[in-house]
């Protein structure tokens, strides 16, 4: 998920009290009440989602495994008065192989009013959370499917960690609406193919906003139409958005705009939609856009969506990497590192999630590990090694080591994020970040950033216009790292990503001899070199092969192992601190 410190779904999350709001008809005659019942708006967590709808990703069923989405066009109108959504979707489906009964995902809380295939009305089956078309789609064929639907969408309990609609109010009482869908999937908002590789090649959005509200969204603004009753329709178009990146944002926004002249020669539109009355704070955040963009373009490569915009919108939830319209809800909090970590983290996802998308939830550490590593790396770029070390240390203390980050099979979102279902949880953020930190030291900056660049762009020489969004896997990254480093590093990824426990460095000192060896889960090979500093001498990199390493040191010398904390490894001190912290939290 986008935000690096999500509450655990297994019981540590903060639950909101149930609140129901209705029209107050206390002064209306009893007969009138009977004729016009009180309308109760849905509470958080309502209407409930079925188990099928909550699943996002996983093994694709036969009725979807050969489907691709060439284009989607959505007409969406949320109504804050009733908290209902009226929608129409036009999907251009393509079959890469014959599909007997093509299926589209859509939450059962929506009523499907009409479905047409290539203009002809059809009656689809509507099993739990799906729309199954009655006719086959031959290999290579395309079909244009139109779906009219409406209903009460699921209201988020605690967005973005529990997805759904957020029907909030601005400080002056006006509607402030947002949606998040990463965890439960795109089907809680629009008819889609709810798996990572279900991205539409192009998405066109038509969002109707109540009078006085604006509707910033993904991609490039095509225009705004004003209806006779004061409502407005906002038209947007985006290239290959992530399935969960399509989002609703409506409020009485004000916008700050500018243009960034990229080092690659292109002009990138900048826009920040914020609530009224927060101009000074909003301009402070907007001032971070250009230097942050410069960092990413220098270190990683060109901003992937420069032909559309760098867009950010203030939201009534913490944040999410909605493509070209990143959700921001950090309330302009200040931090000692001097930049807004939430903005920087979500913006990192434009490279690590939206340009390069993990092909399977099992590979989502490529999103969150890289995006989490970008905050200390940016701090290093701004202030140097000391700030970098401080931020890396804070991440180190969050690593839980409950489960492997990568399991080499197709997983659902819940199987990755929820420890109760075997998931690594927040380790895909912090352990992923530390894995990259150690890898960068092991192979050096040139190889590390070259492999990263090829992972993101699919080529070593990205320039605006010569790349498109792509899918990637952990194995892809391993191959790129091996090619750039000139060595097989499968042992590195097997220990850090495919094992739960951290490697432990065993130190044995006797007289004038220091012996070092590695202990790993399942006795996996781990020939990780180690820096050793003896006395005041500079640290030396010592090879530690399978048989271990023996170093001669003066008997009375002070020895520091890994003095610059290059290597992610078991630490008795960190383990003791984490146990104490947990005892403080639970009162045990």
Model-inferred region functions:
Residues 87, 181-182, 193-344, 373, ...:
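Hydrophobic helix-coil surface modules that form long, contiguous segments used
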Residues 102, 112-117, 216, 489-490, ...:
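Beta-strand-rich binding/interaction modules
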Residues 15, 24, 28-86, 113, ...:
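N-terminal, polar/Ser/Thr-rich
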């Amino acid at each position: 998920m986008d935000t690096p410190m999500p509450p655990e779904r297994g019981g540590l999350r903060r639950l909101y009290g149930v609140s129901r709001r209705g029209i107050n008809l206390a002064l209306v005659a009893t007969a009138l009440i009977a004729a016009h019942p009180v309308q109760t708006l849905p509470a958080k967590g309502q209407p409930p989602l079925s188990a099928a709808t909550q699943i996002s990703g996983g093994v694709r069923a036969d009725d979807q495994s050969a489907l691709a989405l060439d284009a989607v066009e959505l007409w969406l109108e949320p109504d804050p008065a009733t908290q209902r959504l009226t929608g129409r979707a036009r999907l251009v489906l393509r079959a890469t192989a014959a599909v007997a009964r093509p299926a589209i995902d859509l939450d059962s809380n929506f009523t499907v009013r009409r479905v047409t295939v290539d203009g002809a009305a059809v009656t689809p089956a509507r099993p739990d959370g799906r729309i199954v078309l009655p006719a086959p789609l031959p290999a290579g064929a395309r079909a244009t499917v139109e779906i009219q639907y409406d209903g009460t969408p699921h209201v988020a309990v605690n967005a973005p960690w529990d997805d759904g609609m957020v029907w909030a109010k601005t400080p002056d009482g006006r509607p402030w609406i947002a949606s998040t869908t990463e965890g439960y999937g795109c089907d809680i908002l629009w008819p889609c193919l709810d798996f990572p590789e279900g991205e539409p090649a192009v998405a066109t959005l038509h969002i109707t906003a109540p009078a006085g509200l604006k509707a910033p969204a993904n991609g490039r603004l095509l225009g705004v139409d004003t209806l006779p009753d004061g409502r407005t329709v906002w038209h947007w178009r985006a290239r290959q958005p992530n399935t969960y990146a399509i989002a609703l944002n409506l409020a009485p926004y004000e916008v700050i705009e500018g243009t960034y002249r990229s080092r690659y020669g292109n002009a990138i539109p900048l826009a920040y939609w914020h609530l009224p009355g927060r101009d000074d704070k909003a301009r402070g955040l907007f001032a971070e856009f250009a230097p942050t963009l410069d960092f990413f373009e220098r270190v990683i490569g060109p901003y992937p969506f420069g032909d559309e915009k760098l867009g950010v919108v203030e939201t009534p939830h913490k944040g999410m990497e909605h493509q070209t319209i990143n959700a921001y809800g950090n309330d302009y909090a200040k931090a000692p590192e001097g930049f807004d970590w939430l903005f920087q983290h979500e913006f990192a996802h434009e490279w690590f999630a939206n340009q390069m998308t993990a092909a399977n939830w099992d590979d989502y550490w490529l999103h969150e590990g890289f995006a989490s590593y970008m905050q200390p790396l940016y701090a290093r770029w701004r202030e140097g090694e000391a700030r970098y070390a401080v931020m890396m240390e804070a991440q180190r203390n969050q690593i839980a080591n409950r489960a492997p980050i990568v399991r080499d099979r197709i997983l659902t979102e819940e199987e990755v994020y929820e420890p109760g279902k075997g998931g690594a949880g927040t380790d895909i953020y912090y352990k992923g970040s530390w894995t990259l930190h150690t890898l960068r030291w092991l192979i050096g900056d040139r190889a590390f950033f070259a492999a990263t660049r090829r992972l993101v762009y699919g080529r070593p020489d990205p320039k605006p216009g010569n790349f498109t969004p792509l899918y990637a896997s952990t194995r892809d990254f391993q191959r790129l790292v091996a090619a750039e480093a000139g060595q097989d590093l499968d042992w590195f990824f097997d220990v850090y990503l495919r094992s739960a426990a951290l490697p432990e460095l065993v130190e044995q000192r006797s007289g004038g001899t220091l012996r070092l060896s590695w202990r790993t889960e399942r006795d996996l090979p781990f020939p990780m070199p180690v820096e050793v500093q003896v006395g005041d001498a500079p640290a030396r990199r010592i090879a530690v092969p399978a048989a271990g390493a023996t170093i001669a040191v003066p008997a009375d010398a002070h020895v520091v192992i890994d003095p610059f904390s290059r290597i992610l490894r078991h630490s008795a001190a960190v383990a003791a601190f984490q146990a104490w912290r947990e005892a403080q939290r639970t009162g045990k």
